[in-house]
Amino acid sequence: MASLIQVRDLLALQGRMEAMQISRTLHTPQPMIDAMLNQLENMGRAVRIQEDPDGCLSGSCKSCPEGKACLREWWTLR
């Protein structure tokens, strides 16, 4: 089980990562990582970066059957 400090240190080393990448790297369940990232965000230590839907080259994101699942969410330290 990873700690909040380990999540912060991993983000410091990698620059930016997705929550799923952090979960796999630290061998910690995704809901736990999501909670830790939200806590870091509330503390002002981490920032959530969401991709702009205008960046879709095909323009089909608006009609995507997966509900914009192709849009990625990154985390980085402040």
UniProtKB/Swiss-Prot annotation:
Record's keyword terms, sorted: DNA-binding, Iron, Iron-sulfur, Metal-binding, Repressor, Transcription, Transcription regulation
> Does Transcription show up as a keyword for this record?
yes
A GO term for molecular function: DNA binding
What InterPro entries has UniProt attached to this entry? FeoC, Tscrpt_reg_HTH_FeoC, WH-like_DNA-bd_sf, WH_DNA-bd_sf
Tell me the residue numbers annotated for binding iron-sulfur cluster.
C56, C61, C64, C70
> What function does the entry list?
May function as a transcriptional regulator that controls feoABC expression.
Q: What family does the entry list?
A: Belongs to the FeoC family.
**Identification of the protein by name:** Probable [Fe-S]-dependent transcriptional repressor
List the taxonomic lineage.
Bacteria, Pseudomonadati, Pseudomonadota, Gammaproteobacteria, Enterobacterales
